[in-house]
């Protein structure tokens, strides 16, 4: 019985920004990755682990995602990504992508809607709480800041972020949010991603 491919192949992690610049702007990009596939194949690489290429304001180097359905402009276009998938297939190199769904960017459309009002349909996509005596709901700290809570004066509540204040935590108790994330995942799988690494999975 043959072992699954992900147990046997050599993986190579690619951080797009610093891997290979194809157009001289000083930023690595998808076309740069494509240009190095022959070399990766020669090395014996059987799968690449691609760090985030999604649209992001880059408050945390791409791990703050503004739009899960778009490619960061600095890295290229969706057509470039589709070409990458095609070229990987020709080289028999599998594609694994970072899945960042513990949180989104605070510029994501869901969070923009969520912070508008307490009765907004997207409010419960994130974790909001009342403060205590004018302070944070509790004493939790984040990985990046002393407090895991940030105040939003629009609705006089605090939102949870286990990373930076630019990365509000998604509420995995919300069924509608989960359904949207699962649908997004399936769309990327349909494009040719074969497997995900779940970033910050232990924080979900």
Regions found by a protein language model. Give the residues of each.
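Acidic/aromatic-lined carbohydrate-recognition and catalytic surfaces
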Residues: 2-182, 186, 190
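Conserved small/polar residues in nucleotide/adenosyl-binding loops
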Residues: 196-204
């Amino acid at each position: 019985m043959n072992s699954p491919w992900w147990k046997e192949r050599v993986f190579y992690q690619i951080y797009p920004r610093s891997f290979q610049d194809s157009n001289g702007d000083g930023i690595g990009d998808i076309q740069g990755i494509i240009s190095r596939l022959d070399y990766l194949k020669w090395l014996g690489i059987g799968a690449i682990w691609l760090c985030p290429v999604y649209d992001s304001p880059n408050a945390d180097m791409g791990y703050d995602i503004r739009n899960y359905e778009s490619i960061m402009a600095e890295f290229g276009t969706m057509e470039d990504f589709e070409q990458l998938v095609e070229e990987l297939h020709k080289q028999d190199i599998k594609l694994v992508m970072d899945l960042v769904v513990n949180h989104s960017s605070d510029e994501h459309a869901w969070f923009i809607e969520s912070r508008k009002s307490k009765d907004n349909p997207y409010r419960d996509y994130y974790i909001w709480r009342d403060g205590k005596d004018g302070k944070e709901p509790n004493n939790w700290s984040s990985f990046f800041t002393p407090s895991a809570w940030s105040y939003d004066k629009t609705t006089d509540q605090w939102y949870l972020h286990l990373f930076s204040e630019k990365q509000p935590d998604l509420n995995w108790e919300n069924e509608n949010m989960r359904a949207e994330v699962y649908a997004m995942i399936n769309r990327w799988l349909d494009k040719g991603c074969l497997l995900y690494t779940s970033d910050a999975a232990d924080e979900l």
